[in-house]
């Protein structure tokens, strides 16, 4: 016969060893015991074989990791004594698959040996007769589960009880001409008198709802302290960095590369949003204004000869249209005005008294003409005085060039002066033409006011010469 196999296994459990039933015949009990022991031997063999396979797999993984460690250690020992800088390129992500392999049980795919077909055994002995006394004696030794849970008592109902099945509307639940639901609370109510008599004791106890106590700020008249709001804005702070005073080069240090130089400005700092300090701007010397006066005197002190009328006079008038109405004077007066503007020396009284901003050369020229009194007040100079003044100015230029020869800005200014002379068509040794003088006057700044002299004496000297 085939023994009855009882399943006492959990969900997901692969193996289930059969139990031997009590009160079996001798031959039947021996057969079931032999079958259970064989089944247990197969199960234990399968379990230990799977554990051995898992241990071998883990041992191979540990061996592969050990080989990687030994290889890395050999590389480290190779570069350990080197004094050259080595760049190490590392991946931005951890070297692992995006999705890890899920854990699998070692009993995955195992089959239950008990499902295999086993041989059938024929037993010749007969069943024993049922003995009720022996069955009662077994009840004393084995616990029997008896339900001893007390039945719940019916709670006292306040209303009429459950709803009847023949009620067709909600109004049938209410007392006549009232809003009292008798199935919920049973009361005696006279619709005409309005008096209510409660029958249940619990209905007589009325609970008064009281308000909660007032807060301490009202009851004790205490003023709450104003809480300072917390600031959750991010304020980066570099903190205090210790200053280390070490030499810039330390030779023959073990494990330190000597062919690598670090630059402080390689990238943004650790706190790029922190308010940085504004770098100090370089200061410039204001010595440029002094050679500028020399250039102005150069350009102003080269007037055209007085006898013929100067041809560039119409150019000046055309280049400065917003002149006052006094510009419509004869050509002779224009020549006199050119002479007066070109001879701006310390002996001239009508020179401009203020130096205008050098940003606009033509505007300053017109302003100086207006301050000098226009063309009508121009003064004529003799040829001898102009030649003497020209020699003095050349000597002053040479002295200043020698005294300021090492200054970068003065050298640059002298080069610009020479370039202007070359563009205007006059070299360093050639005489200056009237066109170049007026062009330079228009691009320059008027000089500072010289010491004033009596106008009458100046007029007499000019006319006598």
From Swiss-Prot:
Gene Ontology terms: cellular component: autophagosome; centriole; cytosol; early endosome; early endosome membrane; late endosome; recycling endosome; recycling endosome membrane
PROSITE patterns according to UniProt: WH2
InterPro entries to which the protein is assigned, alphabetical: WASH1, WASH1_WAHD, WH2_dom
Signal peptide interval: none
Coiled-coil residue spans: none
Compositional bias annotation for Pro residues: 302-314
Chain positions covered by the region annotation Required for WASH complex assembly: 1-54
Gly residues bias (residue ranges): 424-436
Keyword Zinc belongs to the record: no
Compositionally biased spans, kind Acidic residues: 456-465
Stretches the record annotates as WHD1: 1-167
Region (VCA): 349-465
GO biological processes: Arp2/3 complex-mediated actin nucleation; endocytic recycling; endosomal transport; exocytosis; protein transport; regulation of Arp2/3 complex-mediated actin nucleation; retrograde transport, endosome to Golgi
Bias (Basic and acidic residues): 382-398
GO MF, one annotated term: gamma-tubulin binding
Segments of this protein annotated with the region Disordered: 297-407, 422-465
One Pfam family, short name: WASH_WAHD
Recorded domain comment: The VCA (verprolin, cofilin, acidic) domain promotes actin polymerization by the Arp2/3 complex in vitro.
Note: WASH genes duplicated to multiple chromosomal ends during primate evolution, with highest copy number reached in humans, whose WASH repertoires probably vary extensively among individuals. It is therefore difficult to determine which gene is functional or not. The telomeric region of chromosome 9p is paralogous to the pericentromeric regions of chromosome 9 as well as to 2q. Paralogous regions contain 7 transcriptional units. Duplicated WASH genes are also present in the Xq/Yq pseudoautosomal region, as well as on chromosome 1 and 15. The chromosome 16 copy seems to be a pseudogene.
Name recorded for this polypeptide: WAS protein family homolog 2
Gene this protein is translated from: WASH2P
